[in-house]
A protein has these predicted regions:
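Acidic, proline/glycine-enriched N-terminal capping motif
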Residues: 1-142
Length: 142
């Protein structure tokens, strides 16, 4: 029997931001943007709750990520209807891989030891009335 964990992260998904650089004299340090750090923490909290006392998975992993972005308030009723029916998809805002990076970084050490264990990934980005992410992670069957 394979272990499987399914959980949701409520709120508008945040893509992984580019690292920032700060110069302190001769030294340059890098840091992640606050929005990225906060979102990764939110994912970590949801993952900890879903995992309970289960240890992080150690073998190959399969992940499915369903990203729901809120429909922009500026959209017309016609466009809103198209978004909710799936006719229009979010193609303007952020690459899907940047959302996945932030989600995987939030799950590191909790759901799995390291995101390099992910051997199969299915990610979908859609519009919805509220923003959220649904995540399913399971051991890969050989």
């Amino acid at each position: 029997m394979t272990f499987q964990v399914i959980f949701q992260v409520e709120g508008t998904p945040v893509p992984k931001g580019r690292p920032r650089f700060a110069r302190r004299g001769k030294f340059v340090s890098t840091y992640s943007p606050k929005t990225t750090v906060d979102y990764e923490s939110k994912v970590s909290d949801a993952a900890k709750l879903a995992m309970g006392s289960q240890k992080p998975l150690e073998g190959p992993i399969v992940a499915c990520i369903y990203i729901t972005l809120p429909i922009p308030a500026s959209y017309s009723k016609k466009r809103l209807k198209a978004c909710l029916s799936g006719e229009e998809r979010p193609i303007k805002r952020s690459d899907i891989d940047n959302f996945c990076k932030a989600i995987f970084d939030g799950m590191n050490g909790i759901v799995f030891e390291d995101d390099s264990q992910v051997v199969s990934l299915h990610a979908t980005k859609v519009y919805g009335t509220v923003g959220m992410v649904e995540i399913m992670v399971q051991e890969h069957l050989l």
